[in-house]
From Swiss-Prot:
Name under which the protein is recorded: K(+)-insensitive pyrophosphate-energized proton pump
Main location: membrane
Isomerase in keyword set: no
Subunit and partners: Homodimer.
Compartments reported by the entry: Cell inner membrane
Record-listed Mg(2+) 1 binding positions: 189, 193
Binding positions for Mg(2+) 2 per the UniProt entry: 216, 219, 434
Record: residues binding Ca(2+): 646, 672, 676
EC number: 7.1.3.1
GO CC aspect terms: plasma membrane
Site feature Important for ion transport, where: 178, 223, 230, 680, 691
Enzyme superclass (EC): translocase
Stored HAMAP family: PPase_energized_pump (MF_01129)
Amino acid sequence: MTALWLIVLCGVLSVVYAIWATSSVLSADAGSPRMQEIAAAVREGAQAYLRRQYTTIGIVGIVIFVLLVYFLGFYVAIGFAIGAILSGAAGFIGMNVSVRANVRTAQAATTSLAGGLELAFKAGAITGMLVAGLALLGVTLYFGFLVYSLKLAPDSRVVVDAMVALGFGASLISIFARLGGGIFTKGADVGGDLVGKVEAGIPEDDPRNPATIADNVGDNVGDCAGMAADLFETYAVTAVATMVLAAIFFAKTPILMSMMTLPLAIGGICIITSIIGTFFVKLGPSQSIMGALYKGLIATGVLSLIGIAVVIYTLIGFGKLDGVDYTGMSLFECGVVGLIVTALIIWITEYYTGTDYRPVKSIAAASVTGHGTNVIQGLAISMEATALPAIVIIAGILVTYSLAGLFGIAIATATMLALAGMIVALDAFGPVTDNAGGIAEMAGLPKEVRKSTDALDAVGNTTKAVTKGYAIGSAGLGALVLFAAYNQDLKFFVADSAHHTYFAGVNPDFSLNNPYVVVGLLFGGLLPYLFGAMGMTAVGRAASAIVEEVRRQFREKPGIMQGTDKPDYGKAVDLLTKAAIKEMIIPSLLPVLSPIVVYFLIYAIAGGGATGKSAAFSAVGAMLLGVIVTGLFVAISMTSGGGAWDNAKKYIEDGHYGGKGSDAHKSAVTGDTVGDPYKDTAGPAVNPMIKITNIVALLLLAILAH
């Protein structure tokens, strides 16, 4: 009981930190009336979009809530609601701070680079701490309520199902937020660039471009609210999956409760280390912004190592554990592996997307010979970028499995995600600096201010790319833990078919000789591609609508280009809001319905009865692995490739290969418009898709067992 209260205290601390940081950000100077006017337009657009998005999700959520009450009971449905509401809240609050911090960052940059950095990072840290804190509070308090208030056994089905449903609630918000936000932001970005930069020849964030405000709104709904929901979900889902595994592996042992609280305790201690880490972010004498941010991340990592050692030692000791053949020490070693995997994935992603390294420079060089060669080189880099992260994840799985079996992999993933607070802070720093640059440009601030905001924005682009790499790596491992939970859960029901009569005579066979397993693998493998295609098509459609709208305004109001007429910014925002909401629903339902359809389809094809059930459970399990395997590669290649295309354009804009306006620059803009939906819509949305498929399969087991 004390352990749970201490974990809750850590969660509360993160919320207190967020409140303190918010008041500190809001007390900063908000700049000139012109700057405030632009910021207000961005804020209104972002709030209007989120209201629509949450209303739509709310309708879908209520339907699922009712179904869960019917199939699995009230407490499971409440778990779903908690996950959904908290995930939505983290994104909503974070974004509301971010749209107020942008103008203050632009104003702070007029005095010093350090001031701009401090404000933008603090705004990002608010979202980060809310994500980690609310996810931890949601899981811990509901688990505590079920176990201590309702007096349910920690490994009872109600508790396990309610925890899985909580993860499902977070997942649902996450896939909608990622996809909807991504369609909005990239529709504006691609559409605005095609007409503004390529046709009209005006620079980025030029106030004459009617899509400018929509582009700045998009940064917030995509990168701030979208990323927050994504990592909230991975955090909650991994904690839940680790708890489910603990409930199965340590069912009849005295350490059951300690093992189930272990992932939560690791999360709790890492919130404290993340909060301490934020105070290390200071601009040093070298004036390296990335260096300042990495100082905070490294401090968090080192402190977390010590914290995790303390947590494991106090909860379960370093010695031999009941019921299994590994020690507490080997679980700590798995935690260390989790931190090493995090560091390596971040470093590899930066290598593939940073302007200082070979991949980005090679795309920039290829732009000299034209649009085609830019796209060819960009695609080559996007494929190459999958190799090293995959090898790191493979090594992580092998080492942790040999140390402590499946539970070791789960603890490594839980440790990886325990740093989510700091990582989301780095990510949410991106849209704040991006918007600050836009506001500085539109308000006509002096050149040296633009220089500061550009420097911050360039780093913001790298942090956004780096955190996407982390989000995918952790999602892949998290999904693997969920697959293990599916497999163990299935074994549990089959072994206990006296109580769960549906599973009588079922004998799932995951060997590769089973044709149903091969069918499942292939079916799972196609899902990320199909899902990615839907996302890309949606962006293409939204961008076309924006291109038409911007051209129409330029045609009907020739005064816009002379600066005598004002563009109608609201029209573009409204158009994108409608498009994004409409386009996000069908793709989001794909991973929700797939496991159910595959199960009943294979059940019917294999002739029903116990044989049909065995075939269907095997096919669904294989499908989950198929989704993880191709999903990982699709997501990494899209996010890293897109990031490299984007930064190749920035590299040329910095004066290489002829600089802005050169032929190489025009080719690089083409590459960037391809890379945009790659890295900000389809790629990141594959993350929640992988996990939803796995969670729905777990819930399907629970429903069939009832």
